[in-house]
């Protein structure tokens, strides 16, 4: 079942936010949270601003949510930053989006290192501009020994493409005698995905009021809890993430059982 902005904190105005955080941390925190960051363009349009202004503001929210997820002891935070379909957007917007990782990491990387955050990237990196790849590679290299939160960017990522690529690699290994067809299993296919070293997301969040998955981690979210909110990504705050996690904690996850 899916909820929007379920008001678990209604009536608790006299309670400090820090106290609420500590209360939530006493419950089970999802190991892996994935977020479809949506609504940057519409946020800007409502303010008569260019779409790129929304993307810039959205990156500031990434900083806040990353720090807060780390504080909550979330182990993996995957952010859908740019899909394989996003190349269809206006060139000016795409060019700006390709510059954002360099701008973002140029200022935020020292804090990520200090916070013990490890940066990873999934997606088709070969199509990314050189300056974008270099920024991501530097961040991954500089944080590879960090043992805290894994900040995983899905950049030029499409789930169908990921699954097709995994099957192609499995077929190649089968032809070379590395695996036998009777050995193929869900676990084996998972091991060929870009997320093979990560747990599957337990909680998937999408902002902006859209109720779809948009070709994001289709295999990995088979048993994820979905949480949708009408809030645009630039307006997404720590309180919203805490609300989503509290909602998650109140759900019964039966995985097909009783």
Swiss-Prot record:
Magnesium recorded as keyword: yes
Residues that bind substrate: 39-43, 51, 55, 83-85, 87, 89, 206, 212-214
Keyword Metal-binding found: yes
Xref: Pfam families: Prenyltransf (PF01255)
Bound cofactor: record note: Binds 2 magnesium ions per subunit.
Active site per database record: 38, 86
Top enzyme category: transferase
Assigned keywords, A-Z: Magnesium, Metal-binding, Transferase
Family: Belongs to the UPP synthase family.
Protein name: Isoprenyl transferase
Species for this entry: Bacillus cereus (strain ATCC 14579 / DSM 31 / CCUG 7414 / JCM 2152 / NBRC 15305 / NCIMB 9373 / NCTC 2599 / NRRL B-3711)
């Amino acid at each position: 079942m899916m909820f929007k902005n379920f008001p678990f904190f209604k009536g608790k105005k006299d309670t400090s936010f820090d106290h609420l955080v500590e209360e939530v941390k006493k419950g089970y925190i999802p190991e892996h949270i994935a977020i479809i960051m949506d609504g940057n363009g519409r946020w800007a349009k409502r303010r008569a601003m260019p779409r790129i202004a929304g993307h810039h503001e959205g990156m500031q929210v990434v900083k806040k949510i990353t720090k807060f997820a780390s504080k909550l002891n979330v182990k993996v935070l995957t952010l859908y930053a740019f899909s394989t379909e996003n190349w269809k957007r206006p060139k000016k917007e795409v060019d700006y989006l390709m510059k954002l990782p360099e701008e973002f990491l140029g200022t935020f990387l020292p804090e990520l290192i200090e916070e013990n955050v490890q940066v990873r990237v999934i997606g088709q990196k070969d199509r990314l501009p050189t300056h974008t790849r270099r920024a991501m590679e530097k961040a991954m290299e500089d944080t590879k020994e960090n043992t805290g939160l894994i900040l995983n960017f899905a950049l030029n990522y499409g789930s169908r493409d990921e699954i097709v690529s995994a099957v192609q690699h499995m077929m190649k290994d089968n032809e070379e005698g590395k695996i036998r067809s009777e050995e193929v299993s869900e676990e084996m296919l998972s091991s060929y995905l870009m997320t093979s070293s990560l747990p599957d997301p337990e909680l998937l969040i999408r902002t902006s009021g859209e109720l779809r998955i948009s070709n994001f981690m289709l295999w990995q979210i088979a048993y994820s809890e979905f949480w949708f909110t009408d809030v645009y990504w630039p307006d997404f705050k720590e309180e919203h993430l805490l609300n989503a996690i509290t909602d998650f904690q109140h759900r019964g996850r039966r995985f097909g059982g009783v």
